[in-house]
Amino acid sequence: MVQEVENNNNNNNNNDHLVQSSDPEHPANLIPELCRKFYNWGWVTGTGGGASIRRDEHIFIAPSGVQKELIQPHNIFVLQFPTPKYPPSDRKYIRKPLELKPSACTPLFLAAFERGAGCCIHTHSQWAVLVTLLVEREKGPDGCFEISNIEQIKGIPRGKGKGMMGFFDTLKIPIIENTAFEEDLTGSLEKAMDQYPDTYAVLVRRHGIYVWGDDVAKAKTQCESLDYLFQLAVEMHKLGIPWVK
């Protein structure tokens, strides 16, 4: 079971008011709801994956090592934004749940927020993992995922302020190599962001994907669209149908 945080401590000392709200759209309520959905979709199995939301000067983050379908608002970490990515000891946590660990995804989420994102999602989708393996086999380790002439591509932005992609556009998602520790992915993620400035996602080989958006709804729907495209790509590959027409 998820490690429950007892609320008998002094609420003022840990800024618990930051995660207490009756508003269903509050980040502390949205993150548990999102994680339950992602668990049911097979995206965050076995405590893997995570989600984070930026609201003004605060960043709300799901904890590490917790069964994602059981997360509650009082399990959420809160960071002051902006905050240093490294070292971890310099990060400006203004709320830390007792007995829980900060997410290892934190510096990667921060990389997305530093580029203007309002929400960042990390999944361990099997379809995302499979396409990274197929790309490596077909294009080598430097290849990116590409697909065109599929209607669902319209659910992905062309880039900041550039509208949405069209049916005939070719979607490109960069792929970075996995590392033994999640935090060590940060440099490669930022490099991919620089090389593909219009991307809203980065695949991690044999691991999963990071997807971000201007707000929660956009990050979620983009993640859904990408997962649909990855699954379709795997099935197309089985049938010998090329991804780019």
Swiss-Prot record:
Family as reported in the entry's similarity comment: Belongs to the aldolase class II family. MtnB subfamily.
Example of a GO cellular component annotation carried by this entry: cytoplasm
Pathway linked to the protein: Amino-acid biosynthesis; L-methionine biosynthesis via salvage pathway; L-methionine from S-methyl-5-thio-alpha-D-ribose 1-phosphate: step 2/6
Catalytic function, reaction form: 5-(methylsulfanyl)-D-ribulose 1-phosphate = 5-methylsulfanyl-2,3-dioxopentyl phosphate + H2O
SMART domains, alphabetized: Aldolase_II
Active site: E151
Species classification: Eukaryota, Fungi, Dikarya, Ascomycota, Pezizomycotina
Molecular function GO labels: methylthioribulose 1-phosphate dehydratase activity; zinc ion binding
Physiological role: Catalyzes the dehydration of methylthioribulose-1-phosphate (MTRu-1-P) into 2,3-diketo-5-methylthiopentyl-1-phosphate (DK-MTP-1-P).
Name used for this protein in its record: Methylthioribulose-1-phosphate dehydratase
Region: Disordered, residue numbers: 1-23
NCBIfam families: salvage_mtnB
Highest taxon in the source lineage: Eukaryota
Pfam families registered for this protein in UniProt: Aldolase_II
Swiss-Prot/TrEMBL keywords: Amino-acid biosynthesis, Cytoplasm, Lyase, Metal-binding, Methionine biosynthesis, Zinc
